């Protein structure tokens, strides 16, 4: 685990069948720590993780990862997009969110269907968060865009997308937001000029 930005921690898991890491994130708020798509943690990193852990946000059905363990050990609530809830069965989702909602007063929900019906992105709104304001805006993405090949942006294999056309139509929406940092739950994060890089990628998709 490492602190990738002030008050924002990341850790990951590596799998032999894919060339990119699976990343989770922890954002420290005044009222507690919010996790995004958390993979398994080494016991030593459990001790480092800022407490209390109040919330786990899942961006899509395939990113449950270790969410249940965080709920069991810390009593964290699990949140997902309202159009994705049925995709998690038999996992119980504690609260649902939709386009425009704020989680913990600062994480803005962006609905990005295509990979799955209710995938969400999370925008750490600079209006409500000092670090995001200082960094020029921070965006978290689950599977809508991944950091592969390393150092570049890409999509997951098309056979894993419910509706590739819908996903391509959803992606321009994130360009309505101002961000310079892109923290990806699959693959390498982009720590500078992220919006420009996303804009160029979206244009290439057509």
What positions do the PLM features span?
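Short hydrophobic/charged patches on amphipathic alpha-helices used for structural packing
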Residues: 24, 46-47, 171
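Short conserved beta-strand segments at catalytic cores or DNA/RNA-binding microdomains
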Residues: 24-28, 144
